[in-house]
């Protein structure tokens, strides 16, 4: 089984307009972590970069202009190399299952990122199946098995379950 653990940090919540600022993940194949990546990305021209989003992430606008942050085109090139290393995009059965917390958002951001690079084929690499605890939490709350907490943020649930949280 091929799993792509994925997390994004963005300049807002609109996949088409918000900047993708950070793309991080782990590639796991047959229960072994085989690669990790962490890309810092310069906002694309005209993109939304909400100061509150940066504050939550502990970033500044000035930081986004540093050499640490690469263009979307450069990031796309290196990220695609990772995908191509592990997936045969022409094989319908060879896909990553994407895993993460609220991973639907991350996939939407990634899909917009691909489209800005004139690539409509993200789903040649990833399955429509995902692994995401957030929908399970919502269902278990509706069933009365889990309590309704102040919010459904990952950190809140980690604290509830006594799991160390590292942002």
Model-predicted segments: where are they?
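Conserved non-catalytic scaffold segment of RNase H-like nuclease domains
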Residues: 1-111, 155-159, 164
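Active-site catalytic microenvironments for nucleophilic, acid-base chemistry
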Residues: 113-117, 139-143, 160
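Short, surface-exposed recognition loops or helix-turn segments adjacent to catalytic cores
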Residues: 95-96, 124-131, 166-167
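A structural motif
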Residues: 145-159
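Short coil/loop linkers at secondary-structure junctions
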Residues: 59-60, 120-122, 146, 164
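RecB-family 4Fe-4S metal-dependent nuclease core
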Residues: 109, 119, 138-141, 165
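Short alpha-helix plus adjacent loop in nuclease-associated cores
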Residues: 130-148
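Substrate-recognition/cap helix-loop segment adjacent to the acidic, metal-dependent catalytic center
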Residues: 105-129
